[in-house]
Amino acid sequence: MPIKSRIRTVPDYPKKGIMFRDITTLIKDPVGFRLVIDNMTQHYLSNGVDFDAIVGIESRGFILGGALAYTLGKGFVPVRKPGKLPADVVQLEYELEYGTDKIEMHTDALVQGQRVLLVDDLLATGGTALAAAGLVEKLGGVVASMAFIVNLPDIGGEKKIREKGYNIYFLTEFEGD
């Protein structure tokens, strides 16, 4: 059974008209979770993208990022919501569909020129991923690639991220449904 068929679709969540792609059904399945990690690991071992650390976006990016960091032998750096990191942080505010939000990283999380793989579960508008990339760059890091389990191409995040020059990899997509 492929990855896409293991992802539950929840209609009208979190609001009417939204088709929510729920990866919890994928990652609770040991075969499904292994497929995700093995496919991403193989992709990054074989495609020549060079990076030193994995940056995971709260919260589902922690699940994916932690497992990938382990299998690839890399360190893991969390991107968190405000007030969740105990030491000095760098913060970035970004636009949402209705308002703004903020994310943070420790100021000592990366060193100048350090190359990272940025990971999250799902790419929709691209706002959070671009904000996380902004934090990486604010700290002097370089985003070597971005990886997602799911891409929702109709929402436009992939196009927006590619236009900014970032490399993207995803395992499956839900187009027009």
Curated annotation (Swiss-Prot):
Pathway membership, UniProt: Purine metabolism; AMP biosynthesis via salvage pathway; AMP from adenine: step 1/1
GO cellular component, one term: cytoplasm
Single GO BP term: adenine salvage
Stored InterPro entries: Ade_phspho_trans (IPR005764), PRibTrfase_dom (IPR000836), PRTase-like (IPR029057), UPRTase/APRTase (IPR050054)
Superkingdom assignment: Bacteria
Compartment(s): Cytoplasm
Keywords: Cytoplasm, Glycosyltransferase, Purine salvage, Transferase
Gene Ontology molecular-function annotations: adenine binding; adenine phosphoribosyltransferase activity; AMP binding
Main location: cytoplasm
Gene3D superfamilies: 3.40.50.2020
This enzyme's EC code(s): 2.4.2.7
HAMAP family registered for this protein in UniProt: Aden_phosphoribosyltr
Function: Catalyzes a salvage reaction resulting in the formation of AMP, that is energically less costly than de novo synthesis.
Family: Belongs to the purine/pyrimidine phosphoribosyltransferase family.
Subunit details: Homodimer.
Protein name: Adenine phosphoribosyltransferase
Organism: Chlorobaculum tepidum (strain ATCC 49652 / DSM 12025 / NBRC 103806 / TLS)
Taxonomic lineage of the native organism: Bacteria, Pseudomonadati, Chlorobiota, Chlorobiia, Chlorobiales
